[in-house]
A protein has these predicted regions:
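A short SAM/SAH-binding and catalytic strip from SAM-dependent methyltransferases
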Residues: 116-131
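Conserved SAM-binding loop of SAM-dependent methyltransferases across substrates and taxa
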Residues: 57-70
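S-adenosyl-L-methionine
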Residues: 1-45, 79-118
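Conserved SAM-binding motif I beta-strand of class I
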Residues: 72-79
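C-terminal substrate-binding/active-site "lid" region of AdoMet-derived donor-dependent transferases
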Residues: 128-183
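Conserved class I S-adenosyl-L-methionine
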Residues: 45-58
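Structural motif
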Residues: 53-55, 121-125, 148-151
Length: 183
């Protein structure tokens, strides 16, 4: 329940409450919960340090902390400077414990990908193919990379995928443990 109280504080304190509330829309929450269910299928023997690229307002981080995955710490980066304070407020108890940090940062210029066990990018549709390829080259080969995209055609989605096959082929990641999609 503590997280819900921090979520409400974050919404109340947000400069753009409507935009912050968008992170709680049914589709947003369902896709994040679905992703966590997929992650539970992966064998993990130790507590992981996770980097979330395009972490927005930090909802994914809170859901990860509340899952039964072994999460040590999470850093959430987002290019939008308005997200940092809201994400830190949403995850206040984890921030206080030193387990969460939100940072205003462009994933294309981020320098510390090597400091994490798992890199999660749930905003692939916001990257052109060229940007995605550049971003992928920044990540050390020994990392677990988790990707999520969608097929929503809206102006800010510069690269929506028409289906899972297109996404898998454009991901350029092998081996792929188990590509799957939320219906």
């Amino acid at each position: 329940i503590q997280d819900v109280l921090f979520w409400m504080d974050a919404i109340r304190q947000s400069d753009d409450r409507y935009r912050t509330l968008e992170s709680f829309w049914k589709g947003q929450i369902n896709s994040k919960v679905w992703l966590i269910e997929q992650l539970k299928k992966l064998p993990r023997a130790h507590s992981m340090d996770i980097l979330i690229c395009g972490g927005w307002y930090g909802v994914m981080a809170t859901l990860l902390f509340n899952s039964d995955l072994y999460v040590n710490r999470i850093t959430s980066i987002d290019i939008d400077s308005k997200c940092e304070n809201t994400a830190n407020t949403m995850n206040k108890q984890y921030e206080i414990a030193g387990r969460f940090r939100a940072v205003t940062q462009d994933m294309m210029t981020y320098k510390d990908y090597g400091g994490y066990d798992m890199i999660i990018n749930t905003v692939c549709e916001h990257l052109t193919t060229e940007q995605y390829n550049e971003w992928l080259n920044l990540i050390p080969k020994d990392k677990i990379i988790v990707l999520q995209s969608n097929d929503y055609v809206i102006p800010e989605h510069v690269n929506p995928m028409k289906d899972l096959n297109q996404f898998v082929s454009q991901s350029k990641l092998y081996p792929i443990v188990e590509p799957s999609e939320l219906q």
